[in-house]
């Protein structure tokens, strides 16, 4: 188990080193691999360090081994994308500040202003994935502020980043969605940190802070959700969240509650190991590509195919493959590691992560090159589908359907940015016509 954990960690830092060589990246592969390790590594580490204090070590060992294989293959896929593709990346002059604010305001409008439309068939998926454009604006704004050592602007963009996870906690009672968004936005800083070691230290510190916040949240999760889901006033909801501060503590493997939190919610390895064991014993059968076929079908909008036989959610798959009775009040994702394995075994694991690494690496590379050129229309179209793919705890159906919806949203935002720039240019030309530049005056 220890060796598998080391392989996972080394894979992350090899990927970081690789992406920092030419810095032609927005950090999206880092965001994916970091998100994958977040739901596998803490639980495996807790089992490795505490020995027999936690049950199911044999399942965890299998799960983290498969995760390590997936990490290596994912990094190889990203490397393959960088080795075979070289989009033009000549630096161009563009109004990056205006674009960042356009993305931020537009994204918030989608997320909060158009949220009632999320229930509409197909339209809801486009609005949900298209709203992620606020992450792009925050990412670029925060990078510029940090690069310029402008503390005031960094604080402003940091506050903008905090809006989404805070509201997700207050309105939905969930921490995971906000944490995923924060990871996507902050990953760009690992690429543009002044030194490699500074990026490594930053990842380590952020991981410790994140796990500390998680275990404190987990201790109070039931109270928070009871308040939020019970329709309590906003003041009471804030009070249930700030109540964490009364018993706030640093994450510790000597704390049984912390161990339980890491084992229960940040340990997909148990599910992977259970599924692998049941497959080996013949208690369940391999899916033989059925969920991959479902993923292809999910790309077709339900507005076109109302009776489409696929739907989001993978709790039933997890229950069937592991034999567990799962709590219906909690979301259970099959995860990329388990789903790739339960389809084709180890070959599915290798091929799945190679392909996913290449796809995210390709989109990230093209997005970064477009940003460097000042081609924001291409940047949007590449960024949104890449973010939709960063869902290591989701199913192939959710990922492929989300990426397709994000691509449609990307083309919509591409058009919107083009229209906004055209109107801005027309307004500038109109002002110039009304107040022409005076010519040279007579010599004095």
Regions inferred by a protein language model and the residue ranges of each:
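Juxtamembrane membrane-interface segments at transmembrane alpha-helix termini
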Residues: 40-47, 139-141, 167-171, 189-198, ...
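Hydrophobic alpha-helical segments
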Residues: 120, 328-444
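Hydrophobic alpha-helical transmembrane segments
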Residues: 4-12, 65-74, 131-136, 338, ...
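Aromatic-rich transmembrane-lumenal/periplasmic boundary elements in polytopic membrane proteins
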Residues: 203-309
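N-terminal "leader" segments that precede or initiate the main folded domain
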Residues: 1-86, 182-190, 194-209, 405-412, ...
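Membrane-embedded catalytic interface detector for glycan/lipid assembly enzymes
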Residues: 53, 60, 67-225
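Membrane-interfacial loop-to-transmembrane alpha-helix junctions, especially the N-terminal start
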Residues: 22-35, 91-103, 149-158, 367-380, ...
């Amino acid at each position: 188990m220890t060796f598998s954990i080391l392989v996972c960690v080394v894979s992350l830092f090899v990927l970081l080193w690789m992406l920092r060589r030419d810095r032609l990246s927005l950090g999206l592969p880092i965001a994916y691999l970091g998100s994958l390790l977040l739901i596998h590594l803490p639980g495996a580490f807790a089992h490795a360090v505490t020995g027999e204090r936690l049950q199911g070590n044999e399942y965890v060992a299998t799960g983290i081994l498969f995760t390590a294989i997936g990490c290596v293959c994912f990094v190889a896929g990203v490397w393959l994308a960088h080795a075979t593709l070289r989009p033009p990346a000549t630096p161009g002059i563009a109004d990056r500040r205006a674009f960042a604010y356009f993305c931020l305001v537009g994204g918030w409008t989608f997320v909060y202003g158009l949220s009632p439309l999320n229930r509409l068939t197909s339209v809801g998926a486009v609005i949900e994935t298209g709203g992620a454009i606020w992450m792009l604006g925050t990412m670029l704004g925060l990078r510029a502020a940090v690069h310029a050592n402008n503390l005031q602007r960094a604080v402003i963009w940091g506050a903008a980043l905090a809006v989404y996870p805070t509201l997700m906690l207050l309105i939905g009672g969930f921490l995971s969605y906000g944490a995923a968004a924060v990871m996507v936005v902050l990953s760009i800083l690992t690429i543009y940190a002044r030194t490699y070691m500074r990026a490594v230290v930053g990842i380590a510190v952020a991981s410790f802070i994140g796990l500390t916040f998680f275990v404190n949240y987990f201790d109070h999760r039931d109270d928070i959700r009871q308040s939020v889901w019970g329709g309590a006033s906003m003041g009471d909801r804030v009070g249930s969240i700030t109540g964490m501060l009364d018993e706030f503590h640093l994450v510790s493997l000597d704390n049984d509650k912390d161990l339980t939190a890491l084992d229960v919610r940040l340990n997909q390895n148990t599910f992977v190991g259970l599924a692998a064991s049941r497959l080996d014993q013949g208690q369940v059968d391999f899916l033989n590509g059925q969920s991959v076929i479902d993923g292809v079908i999910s790309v077709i909008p339900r507005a076109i195919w109302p009776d489409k036989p696929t739907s989001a959610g993978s709790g039933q798959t997890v229950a069937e493959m592991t034999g567990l009775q799962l709590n219906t009040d909690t979301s259970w994702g099959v995860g990329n590691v388990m789903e790739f394995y339960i389809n084709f075994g180890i070959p599915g694991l290798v091929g799945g992560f190679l392909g996913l690494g290449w796809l995210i690496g390709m989109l990230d590379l093209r997005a970064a090159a477009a940003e460097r050129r000042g081609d924001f229309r291409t940047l949007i179209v590449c960024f949104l589908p890449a973010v939709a793919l960063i869902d290591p705890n989701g199913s192939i159906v959710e990922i492929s359907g989300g990426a397709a919806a994000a691509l449609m949203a990307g083309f919509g935002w591409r058009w919107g940015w083009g229209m906004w720039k055209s109107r801005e240019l027309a307004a500038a030309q109109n002002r110039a016509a009304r107040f022409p530049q005076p010519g040279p005056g007579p010599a004095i």
